[in-house]
Design a protein with these regions (language model features):
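Acidic helix N-cap motif at the loop->helix transition within catalytic regions
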Residues: 15-17, 45-54
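Short beta-strand/loop segment that forms part of the nucleotide-sugar
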Residues: 20, 32-43, 64-65
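Cell-envelope/extracellular polymer assembly enzymes that use nucleotide-activated donors
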Residues: 2-4, 35
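Short, well-formed alpha-helical segments that are part of the catalytic scaffolds
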Residues: 12-27
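Acceptor/aglycone-binding surface of glycosyltransferases and processive sugar-polymer synthases
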Residues: 62-68, 72-82, 87, 99-179, ...
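Short helix-capping segments at alpha-helix termini
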Residues: 27-32, 55-60
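A conserved acidic beta->alpha catalytic loop
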Residues: 40-49, 95-96
Length: 211
């Protein structure tokens, strides 16, 4: 069984090496093989140089560099296109998603679940950011007719069947979690830990979700 870890990168260059080392440690002995795909979304910092250094020291790491800043969800799509795993994990680069929780997601997927979503029961973001998230998703769900959960972000595992369906989806201006929701595969949610941001500040905002 092969596992692909898709990580869109924008900011947090300090976290890249530690993140990949912790992912590698968490996956040793869990699967036959794995790959970590870091997608540089044209970061205006040292992220690409850190990605290149990491690919030279960790053989399972692959670096992709986009030609311009396309946004987080298109970076995820680029990583999925490159992936070869029977299952793909999507996670953020800032170490708020804990690599040590990947085995829990994987074991749940092996029970026959095509989509397993990490549910952040105790978010470690600032209270104002959590409030903005709740307000955004309230109105987003009201207008879209979807049922998006503000406690669920990118941290998830999906089967190859779901990856294929995701990549055939032609709409480019909708985010990863809502595409997964729209595709209609049975999904289960499991609690995952959520760490405080260790390096830098988030560049993500809810206006980007509306683009």
């Amino acid at each position: 069984m092969q596992l692909s870890i898709i990580i869109p990168v924008y900011g947090s260059p300090e976290s890249i090496k530690e993140l990949c080392e912790r992912v590698s440690t968490s996956l040793r002995g869990l699967v036959d093989s794995f790959e970590i795909i870091l997608v540089d979304d044209e970061c205006p910092d040292d992220s690409w140089s850190e990605i290149k250094k990491t690919t030279q020291t960790l053989p399972n790491v692959i670096g992709l560099k986009l030609s311009r800043n396309f946004g987080q969800h298109k970076a995820i799509c680029a990583g999925l296109h490159e992936s070869k795993g029977d299952y793909c994990v999507v996670m953020d680069c800032d170490l708020q998603d804990l690599p040590e929780d990947i085995p829990t997601l994987y074991e749940k997927a092996k029970e026959g679940n095509d989509v397993v979503l990490g549910q952040r029961i105790e978010r470690q973001d600032k209270k104002f950011k959590v409030l903005k998230s709740k307000v955004f998703y309230y109105f987003f769900n009201l207008l879209s007719g979807l049922n998006s959960d503000p406690t669920v972000a990118n941290f998830s595992i999906i089967s190859r069947k779901v990856v294929t369906a995701y990549l055939s989806f032609k709409e480019q201006d909708i985010d990863y979690t809502n595409v997964i929701n729209w595709l209609g595969f049975d999904a289960v949610k499991i609690p995952v830990r959520h760490a405080e941001r260790k390096y830098g500040e988030s560049s993500y905002n809810y206006w980007k979700l509306m683009e």
